[in-house]
Design a protein with these regions (language model features):
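An acidic, Ser/Thr-enriched, charge-mixed low-complexity segment/SLiM signal
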Residues: 1-169, 191, 198, 235, ...
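Short coil/turn segments at secondary-structure boundaries
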Residues: 46, 84-87, 112-123, 167-173, ...
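Reverse-transcriptase-like RNA-dependent polymerase core
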Residues: 62-70, 75-80, 115-138, 181-209, ...
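Short beta-strand-to-loop capping motifs
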Residues: 89, 314-317
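C-terminal reverse transcriptase regions that engage the nucleic-acid substrate
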Residues: 104-107, 111, 220, 237, ...
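Acidic, serine/threonine/proline- and glycine-enriched intrinsically disordered segments
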Residues: 255, 263, 285, 318-323, ...
């Protein structure tokens, strides 16, 4: 028994001695890449010239233009035809000229890369992490990651370092672990052990997240309210023209209060880092973001624009009315350094999807794509399946007469004995 137990250990030790350099060479290269980015990020408030570093020459970005539906098209807001925007294809030549004039005038409100993020002034809004008085700091160990996850974390850390959103930190009293969640694509059907076809979503990759649960547990909660969706939709309905805008990495535009930055520290295979800008995963981040947007668009909300998190819907009763409103909203964005994601902004369209509902001059309608998804849902076989079906169908209960009566047989199944 002793010889059987010792043999694998000896073999493993011999293998490591012979292949140690090969096993760790790739990991060393990854860590070296991270370290190369760190010197210039230690003082991100200084220009790179002041740090003795020659900035690399900036190249014009190249964008992969995805196919658009027939009612949308790409146009460019610069003479070199580098920076595209998405507008309605139904505009007349005169209307398109007027719209492009406004978009060129407010070019600074549109973001194309992370470098375009200037950061909203802390005087307007900054995120605070107020900890309960009797709470003790928590330092968690890093978690094991498979090679694919490590590559995702490495790329994300590099990207955030280069953008100045995170910085290395060595002495934080709060440390949270990194983990990766799967990004799921379309639905496919696979057989189970009983040869029954079960729909499943295909994992197409991974996304890096920070597990802030220990920090969130001892954080004082912010109860800033979100707008009522039904009231927003009513104000948007029956309008003729819309501009649907979206914040560019919205959370990353809000600064974390200086004394609270160490509480955002995370650990990964490449070191420990803290956030200068607000990360996803903090319990009060959505409330902070909604408060910030409400402050930025004060005087405009419920009058010319509807704001729900980082989705902004500018509307008007005519083209000229909507264009005038868009001019004021983009001007406010530039004044406050709020940057919009060009790829998710649609200008001067006659209809669009807002929070799962189709809005147009006709009023409020269901999103047909979501209805088809509900139709394809499998027959529920357990409590979880019943809740899923009721949740999806209940989203459109305003369009279904006597929904509570129709769904009662399913809701009865959820009652405890």
């Amino acid at each position: 028994l002793a010889s059987i137990a010792v043999a694998p250990n000896n073999a493993l030790q011999q293998f490591l001695e012979e292949h140690e350099s090969d096993v760790f060479e790739e990991e060393r290269k990854e860590i070296d890449d991270i370290f190369l980015c760190q010197p210039q990020m230690l003082r991100h408030d200084l220009p790179v010239e002041d740090l003795g570093i020659s900035p690399p020459p900036k190249e014009d970005p190249v964008f992969d233009l995805k196919p658009l539906p027939d009612d949308l098209k790409y146009v460019y807001i610069d003479d070199k035809k580098i920076y595209p925007v998405i507008i309605s294809s139904k505009l007349s030549g005169e209307e398109e000229t007027k719209l492009l004039h406004i978009l060129k005038k407010h070019r600074g409100a549109l973001g194309y890369t992370l470098d375009d993020l200037k950061g909203i002034s802390p005087a307007i809004c900054q995120h605070a992490i107020n900890i309960e008085p009797d709470a003790k700091p928590v330092v968690e160990a890093q978690r094991r990651l498979i090679p694919k996850m490590k590559e995702v974390v490495r790329n994300e850390v590099l990207k955030l370092l280069e953008a100045g959103i995170i910085y290395p930190i060595a002495d934080s009293r709060w440390v949270s672990p990194v983990h990766c969640v799967p990004k799921k694509g379309g639905i496919t059907v696979v057989p189970n052990e009983n040869d029954e076809l079960i729909p499943q979503r295909v994992v197409v990759g991974y996304r890096m997240c920070i597990d802030f649960r220990k920090v969130n547990k001892v954080t004082k909660k912010d109860h800033y309210p979100l707008p009522f969706i039904d009231q927003m939709l009513e104000r948007l309905s029956k309008k003729t023209h819309f501009c649907f805008l979206d914040g560019y990495s919205g959370f990353s535009q809000i600064a974390v209060r200086k004394e609270d930055q160490e509480k955002t520290t995370f650990t990964c295979p490449y070191g420990t880092y803290a956030y200068r800008r607000m990360p996803f995963g903090l319990c009060n981040a959505p409330a902070t973001f909604q408060r910030c947007m409400s402050a930025i668009f004060h005087g405009f909300c419920e009058e010319i624009v509807e704001v729900f998190m980082d989705d902004f819907s500018v509307y008007g009763t005519s083209f000229d009315n909507c264009l005038h409103n868009l001019d004021k909203v983009l001007q406010r964005c530039e004044e406050t350094n709020l940057v919009l994601n060009w790829e998710k902004c649609h200008f001067m369209v006659n209809e669009g999807i807002v929070l799962g509902h189709k809005i147009s001059e006709r009023g409020i309608e269901v999103d047909r794509a979501k209805v088809k998804a509900i139709e394809k849902m499998p027959c529920p076989r357990d409590v979880k399946g019943i809740r899923s079906v009721l949740g999806h169908a209940g989203f459109y209960r305003r369009f279904i007469k006597d929904f509570s009566k129709i769904s009662k047989p399913l809701t009865n199944l959820l009652q405890k004995d």
